[in-house]
Amino acid sequence: MKMDAYNAVGIAEGFVEAESEEQVIEAWQYLHDTGLGYQLQGFFGRTLQRLIEGGYVHA
């Protein structure tokens, strides 16, 4: 699946099924890299912060 805004948000919210755990991380990395994750509701920014602190998403 090509990662774009729709798929990244869909995977993060659970209405698009990820093909693997790696794709879930790819979706969150996309949301961080594009800044979209910080423009959406607070859940996204808080989750990104935890994923960065855990070393799953690279800042």
Task: Map each language-model feature to its residues.
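Catalytic phosphate/metal-binding cores of nucleic-acid and nucleotide-processing enzymes, i.e., regions
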Residues: 1-59
